[in-house]
From Swiss-Prot:
Residues 23-35 have a biased composition (Acidic residues). It is a multi-pass membrane protein. Its main location: membrane. One of its GO terms (cellular component) is membrane. The chain crosses the membrane at residues 73-93, 96-116, 166-186. The keyword Membrane applies. This is Putative uncharacterized transmembrane protein DDB_G0284801. It is found in: Membrane. It comes from Dictyostelium discoideum (Social amoeba). Residues 1-41 are annotated as: Disordered. Keywords: Membrane, Transmembrane, Transmembrane helix.
Length: 199
Protein backbone atom coordinates (compact mmCIF):
# COMPACT_ATOMS: atom_id res chain seq x y z
CA UNK A 1 0.00 0.00 0.00
CA UNK A 2 2.81 2.35 0.88
CA UNK A 3 4.56 1.53 -2.40
CA UNK A 4 1.42 2.34 -4.39
CA UNK A 5 0.94 5.62 -2.55
CA UNK A 6 4.52 6.62 -3.32
CA UNK A 7 3.98 5.64 -6.93
CA UNK A 8 0.86 7.84 -7.17
CA UNK A 9 2.70 10.76 -5.60
CA UNK A 10 5.60 10.37 -8.02
CA UNK A 11 3.27 10.19 -11.03
CA UNK A 12 1.34 13.26 -9.83
CA UNK A 13 4.60 15.15 -9.28
CA UNK A 14 5.80 14.11 -12.74
CA UNK A 15 2.56 15.32 -14.36
CA UNK A 16 2.87 18.62 -12.47
CA UNK A 17 6.42 19.11 -13.69
CA UNK A 18 5.32 18.28 -17.23
CA UNK A 19 2.50 20.84 -17.07
CA UNK A 20 4.88 23.48 -15.70
CA UNK A 21 7.34 22.70 -18.48
CA UNK A 22 4.59 23.06 -21.09
CA UNK A 23 3.49 26.38 -19.56
CA UNK A 24 7.08 27.64 -19.57
CA UNK A 25 7.46 26.64 -23.22
CA UNK A 26 4.22 28.44 -24.11
CA UNK A 27 5.37 31.57 -22.28
CA UNK A 28 8.72 31.47 -24.09
CA UNK A 29 6.97 31.09 -27.46
CA UNK A 30 4.69 34.05 -26.69
CA UNK A 31 7.67 36.17 -25.64
CA UNK A 32 9.53 35.25 -28.82
CA UNK A 33 6.48 36.13 -30.93
CA UNK A 34 6.19 39.52 -29.22
CA UNK A 35 9.91 40.23 -29.66
CA UNK A 36 9.98 39.10 -33.29
CA UNK A 37 6.80 40.97 -34.24
CA UNK A 38 8.31 44.27 -35.42
CA UNK A 39 5.45 45.13 -37.78
CA UNK A 40 2.88 46.00 -35.09
CA UNK A 41 0.96 48.17 -35.66
CA UNK A 42 1.34 48.43 -39.47
CA UNK A 43 -0.91 51.47 -39.83
CA UNK A 44 1.19 53.54 -37.46
CA UNK A 45 4.38 52.56 -39.30
CA UNK A 46 2.86 53.51 -42.65
CA UNK A 47 1.58 56.73 -41.17
CA UNK A 48 5.04 57.62 -39.88
CA UNK A 49 6.56 56.77 -43.25
CA UNK A 50 4.20 59.06 -45.18
CA UNK A 51 4.57 61.82 -42.61
CA UNK A 52 8.34 61.71 -43.01
CA UNK A 53 7.95 61.90 -46.79
CA UNK A 54 5.39 64.72 -46.81
CA UNK A 55 6.56 66.59 -43.70
CA UNK A 56 10.25 65.69 -43.26
CA UNK A 57 10.75 68.29 -40.52
CA UNK A 58 7.61 67.43 -38.55
CA UNK A 59 8.53 66.86 -34.88
CA UNK A 60 7.03 64.00 -32.91
CA UNK A 61 5.57 63.88 -29.40
CA UNK A 62 8.99 62.92 -28.04
CA UNK A 63 10.83 65.77 -29.79
CA UNK A 64 12.50 68.59 -27.91
CA UNK A 65 10.50 71.57 -26.70
CA UNK A 66 12.49 73.95 -28.93
CA UNK A 67 11.70 72.06 -32.14
CA UNK A 68 8.01 71.95 -31.19
CA UNK A 69 8.00 75.70 -30.53
CA UNK A 70 9.59 76.47 -33.92
CA UNK A 71 7.12 74.18 -35.66
CA UNK A 72 4.17 75.77 -33.80
CA UNK A 73 5.25 79.30 -34.74
CA UNK A 74 5.57 78.33 -38.40
CA UNK A 75 2.20 76.56 -38.33
CA UNK A 76 0.48 79.60 -36.79
CA UNK A 77 2.12 81.91 -39.34
CA UNK A 78 0.99 79.73 -42.25
CA UNK A 79 -2.49 79.46 -40.75
CA UNK A 80 -2.75 83.24 -40.49
CA UNK A 81 -1.97 83.73 -44.19
CA UNK A 82 -4.27 80.91 -45.36
CA UNK A 83 -7.20 83.23 -44.62
CA UNK A 84 -6.27 85.06 -47.82
CA UNK A 85 -7.28 81.94 -49.79
CA UNK A 86 -10.97 81.51 -48.88
CA UNK A 87 -11.65 78.01 -50.24
CA UNK A 88 -8.37 76.48 -49.07
CA UNK A 89 -8.44 78.31 -45.74
CA UNK A 90 -11.95 77.16 -44.88
CA UNK A 91 -12.28 73.76 -46.54
CA UNK A 92 -8.83 72.18 -46.27
CA UNK A 93 -6.56 74.01 -43.84
CA UNK A 94 -8.56 73.26 -40.63
CA UNK A 95 -8.21 69.52 -41.20
CA UNK A 96 -4.50 69.78 -42.07
CA UNK A 97 -3.66 72.03 -39.13
CA UNK A 98 -5.69 69.98 -36.65
CA UNK A 99 -4.07 66.75 -37.80
CA UNK A 100 -0.55 68.17 -37.50
CA UNK A 101 -1.21 69.57 -34.03
CA UNK A 102 -2.65 66.23 -32.90
CA UNK A 103 0.37 64.33 -34.27
CA UNK A 104 2.81 66.64 -32.49
CA UNK A 105 0.99 67.07 -29.15
CA UNK A 106 -1.47 64.14 -29.07
CA UNK A 107 -4.20 65.83 -27.03
CA UNK A 108 -7.95 65.70 -27.61
CA UNK A 109 -8.32 69.17 -26.10
CA UNK A 110 -5.73 70.61 -28.49
CA UNK A 111 -7.48 68.87 -31.38
CA UNK A 112 -10.88 70.41 -30.53
CA UNK A 113 -9.51 73.90 -29.91
CA UNK A 114 -7.48 73.85 -33.13
CA UNK A 115 -10.38 72.70 -35.28
CA UNK A 116 -12.72 75.26 -33.70
CA UNK A 117 -10.25 78.12 -34.14
CA UNK A 118 -9.47 77.28 -37.76
CA UNK A 119 -13.12 76.71 -38.74
CA UNK A 120 -14.74 79.85 -37.30
CA UNK A 121 -14.01 82.89 -39.51
CA UNK A 122 -12.19 85.75 -37.81
CA UNK A 123 -10.25 83.62 -35.30
CA UNK A 124 -7.23 83.00 -37.52
CA UNK A 125 -5.12 85.49 -35.56
CA UNK A 126 -5.10 83.20 -32.47
CA UNK A 127 -1.77 81.28 -32.25
CA UNK A 128 -3.36 77.93 -31.40
CA UNK A 129 -0.28 75.80 -32.01
CA UNK A 130 1.86 78.07 -29.82
CA UNK A 131 -0.80 77.92 -27.09
CA UNK A 132 -0.68 74.11 -27.30
CA UNK A 133 3.09 74.27 -26.87
CA UNK A 134 2.75 76.57 -23.84
CA UNK A 135 0.15 74.26 -22.28
CA UNK A 136 2.42 71.24 -22.72
CA UNK A 137 5.49 73.10 -21.47
CA UNK A 138 4.00 74.79 -18.40
CA UNK A 139 0.90 72.62 -17.65
CA UNK A 140 -1.46 75.58 -17.88
CA UNK A 141 -4.72 73.61 -18.00
CA UNK A 142 -4.11 71.64 -14.74
CA UNK A 143 -3.15 74.89 -12.98
CA UNK A 144 -6.33 76.57 -14.19
CA UNK A 145 -8.40 73.59 -13.00
CA UNK A 146 -7.30 74.25 -9.41
CA UNK A 147 -8.94 77.67 -9.38
CA UNK A 148 -12.10 76.82 -11.29
CA UNK A 149 -15.25 75.54 -9.57
CA UNK A 150 -16.05 71.88 -10.20
CA UNK A 151 -19.24 72.67 -12.10
CA UNK A 152 -17.33 74.74 -14.66
CA UNK A 153 -14.77 71.98 -15.16
CA UNK A 154 -17.56 69.45 -15.78
CA UNK A 155 -19.25 71.88 -18.15
CA UNK A 156 -16.05 72.36 -20.16
CA UNK A 157 -15.43 68.61 -20.33
CA UNK A 158 -18.99 67.96 -21.46
CA UNK A 159 -18.60 70.66 -24.09
CA UNK A 160 -15.38 69.08 -25.36
CA UNK A 161 -17.03 65.66 -25.54
CA UNK A 162 -20.01 67.06 -27.43
CA UNK A 163 -17.80 69.14 -29.70
CA UNK A 164 -15.82 66.04 -30.73
CA UNK A 165 -19.02 64.42 -31.97
CA UNK A 166 -20.10 67.62 -33.72
CA UNK A 167 -16.67 68.00 -35.35
CA UNK A 168 -16.81 64.44 -36.69
CA UNK A 169 -20.33 65.00 -38.04
CA UNK A 170 -19.33 68.30 -39.69
CA UNK A 171 -16.24 66.68 -41.24
CA UNK A 172 -18.33 63.84 -42.68
CA UNK A 173 -20.88 66.30 -44.09
CA UNK A 174 -18.08 68.40 -45.62
CA UNK A 175 -16.54 65.31 -47.24
CA UNK A 176 -19.94 64.29 -48.59
CA UNK A 177 -20.54 67.77 -50.01
CA UNK A 178 -17.13 67.87 -51.68
CA UNK A 179 -17.63 64.42 -53.22
CA UNK A 180 -21.14 65.39 -54.35
CA UNK A 181 -19.82 68.56 -55.97
CA UNK A 182 -17.00 66.87 -57.87
CA UNK A 183 -18.74 63.53 -58.57
CA UNK A 184 -20.07 64.58 -62.04
CA UNK A 185 -16.47 65.13 -63.16
CA UNK A 186 -14.97 61.99 -61.61
CA UNK A 187 -15.02 58.81 -63.75
CA UNK A 188 -15.16 56.42 -60.79
CA UNK A 189 -18.37 58.14 -59.62
CA UNK A 190 -20.04 57.61 -62.99
CA UNK A 191 -19.29 61.07 -64.35
CA UNK A 192 -16.97 62.40 -67.01
CA UNK A 193 -15.00 65.53 -67.72
CA UNK A 194 -17.40 66.43 -70.53
CA UNK A 195 -20.34 66.43 -68.14
CA UNK A 196 -22.78 69.25 -68.78
CA UNK A 197 -25.45 70.20 -66.32
CA UNK A 198 -28.93 70.38 -67.83
CA UNK A 199 -31.46 72.83 -66.47
Amino acid sequence: MKFKRDENQNSTHHRGNKNNTNNDDDDKEEEEEIINDTTMPPLNNEEKYFLKKIFPFLPSRSSSSTSKLIFSLILDLVGFFTQIIPIFGFAFWPSISTYLIFKVYGSGLHLCVSFLEETIPGLGFIPTATCCWANEKYNIIPKVDRYLPTRYIKMVRNFISAFKKIAIAVALIAIYKIISYFSPYLPFFGGSKNHQTSY
